[in-house]
């Protein structure tokens, strides 16, 4: 399936002219091969993403462009940050201080910390294998939240509400971090119970 992601000013071109061109090109031959082009499954129009309060402009040198970003920070930082500020319902703004804050506080401190805690805990306490066991009450509640979060996130992604999906991922990782804090698996007497939930 083909998805188009574009700014609101390009919606007419991608919903009328481009599909019309593809339909008109039906049964086109390229050399001896007959080709049909795939129509967009969904066109997602966004509001504007601004650069520190200004419109992006290549001619004025306002903004940062895709050929430059990979040299500055890991590409996953960019994916995360841009997904977190997608202008799906109103214009949004790229801001360096917000970029730094979200990377440090959300991606690293929340998600990265959780990933490290879980994998390190499994490696240290269970020889790197996820243990099987019975859930306690807190574990059952967390598992229920996981199922609810997974259903929401699946629907968000299916509806192409990517920022909402990301927000739901991070809401759940916050719940798991709270669970770890409450259970204190670093105290050996709690390791088995927490291992059951993992």
Question: Where do the model's predicted regions map?
Answer:
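NTP-dependent nucleotidyl-transfer catalytic core
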Residues: 1-5, 12, 25-41
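Short hydrophobic "helix-edge" motifs at membrane interfaces and signal-peptide entry regions
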Residues: 3-5, 64-65, 149-151
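Short, conserved micro-motifs enriched in small and acidic residues
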Residues: 3-16, 105, 109, 195-196
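Glycine-centered helix-coil hinge/cap
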Residues: 7, 73-74, 161
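Alpha-helical support elements that line or immediately flank enzyme active sites
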Residues: 17-25
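Active-site and channel-lining beta-strand-loop segments
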Residues: 20-21, 31-61
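Catalytic adenosine-cofactor/nucleotide-binding cores of aminoacyl-tRNA synthetases and other
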Residues: 47-140
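Helix-rich, typically C-terminal accessory recognition domains appended to large enzymatic cores
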Residues: 98-135, 142-198
């Amino acid at each position: 399936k083909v998805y188009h992601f574009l700014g609101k000013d390009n919606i007419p071109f991608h919903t009328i002219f481009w599909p019309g061109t593809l339909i008109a090109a039906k049964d086109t031959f390229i050399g001896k091969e007959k080709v049909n082009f795939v129509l967009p499954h969904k066109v997602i129009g966004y509001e504007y993403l601004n650069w520190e309060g200004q419109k992006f402009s290549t001619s004025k040198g306002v903004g940062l462009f895709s050929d430059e970003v990979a040299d500055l920070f890991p590409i996953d930082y960019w994916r995360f940050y841009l997904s977190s500020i997608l202008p799906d319902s109103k214009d949004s703004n790229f801001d360096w201080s917000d970029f730094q804050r979200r990377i440090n506080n959300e991606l690293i401190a929340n998600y990265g910390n959780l990933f490290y805690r879980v994998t390190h805990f499994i490696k240290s306490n269970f020889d790197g294998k996820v243990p099987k066991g019975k859930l306690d009450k807190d574990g059952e509640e967390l598992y229920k939240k996981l199922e609810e979060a997974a259903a929401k996130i699946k629907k968000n992604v299916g509806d192409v509400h990517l920022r909402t999906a990301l927000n739901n991922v991070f809401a759940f990782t916050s719940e798991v971090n709270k669970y770890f804090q409450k259970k204190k698996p670093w105290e050996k007497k709690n390791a088995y119970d927490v291992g059951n939930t993992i």
